[in-house]
Amino acid sequence: MAVVSMKQLLESGVHFGHQTRRWNPKMAPYIFTSRKDIHIIDLKRTALEIEKAYAALYDIAKDGGTVLFVGTKKQASEAIKEEAIRAGQFYVDHRWLGGTLTNFKTIRQRIKLLHSLYAAEADGTWAKLPKKEVLGLSRQRIKLERFLGGIKDMQRIPQALFVVDPRTEEIAVKEARKLGIPVFGIVDTNCDPDLVDYIIPANDDAIRAVKLLTWVMANAVVEANGGVVEKYEDEENAPFEQDEPRKPSQKPKQNRPENKPRFDKQAPRAAAKPEVKAEVKPEVKPEVKVEAKVAPKVVAEVKPTEDLSTLKVAELKELAKAKGIENYSKLRKAELVEALSK
């Protein structure tokens, strides 16, 4: 029985590669075709290479070898950590520290410091220190735990290295090849397959694809150590399984003709709307009448013109404007009085 089905590979988007302009010609044997300037990986070759890598990793774990899972990309860090813990192996899910393999003695000293900080916190030593010093030690512990937490129990160099995207994990791959450690890797169409001993041509940018392939390789270690392989569960497909029991709940919605008379009873409420409009209309009419009454009052106040000489020039001009005298704005006061008195 195959370790992974073609349907799982297809649904997880394993076959999607990078843009054609970013490809590595060495990946040509693993490319099926290209669509819309994106390479499509041959899933038959992917399934074949997965079988080879699975068998090789199984043999290494069967002989008591340890595996270091490496994936510092955002798309891979979570899956790498979960599957490595499930398989009882080591992992690096954040930045790879240079010399983790080639200078393992120095790394071991940092790991010992991390363990000493754990012990000091557990036995109550930190409680006797000033708060400022405790805060500094706490920050140091968090930093060491972030980069070395996945390998804090690794006593010796691992016998295999599994990486997601050899381009991103270039330093880790170089250190492993320098020490003769076999490298298993998920290689996309923009990577160099020669850097990896056991290539898995697949999409290394999709979370679902990375999770599926990491799950498969972790199963090789679990099976070699006599563990039980868990069934693969895709979180994104889980909601579709929950939709099935909800189907019966839709039937009562179709059997609602009994409730239709209830809505008919509420019809008179809609008829009440014109009544509101009728009340608004008479309120608008008196407002117009009031405005018409104000107009004659203003004219009555302007009419008295007994002593025009006592008025100001501005007032005379307003009267001249109302009377329709031409060029009234250029006339002087005496001329305005004379024109208005005619």
Curated annotation (Swiss-Prot):
Key words, A-Z: Ribonucleoprotein, Ribosomal protein
UniProt GO BP: DNA-templated transcription termination; translation
Chain ranges passing through the membrane: none
Region Disordered, annotated ranges: 235-283
Domain of life of the organism encoding this protein: Bacteria
One GO location term (cellular component): cytosolic small ribosomal subunit
GO function terms (MF aspect): structural constituent of ribosome
Cited SUPFAM superfamilies: Rho N-terminal domain-like, Ribosomal protein S2
Classification via PANTHER family: 30S RIBOSOMAL PROTEIN S2 PROKARYOTIC AND ORGANELLAR, SMALL RIBOSOMAL SUBUNIT PROTEIN US2M
Family assignment from sequence similarity: Belongs to the universal ribosomal protein uS2 family.
HAMAP family hit by this protein: Ribosomal_uS2_B
Protein known as: Small ribosomal subunit protein uS2
UniProt source species: Acholeplasma laidlawii (strain PG-8A)
Gene coding for it: rpsB
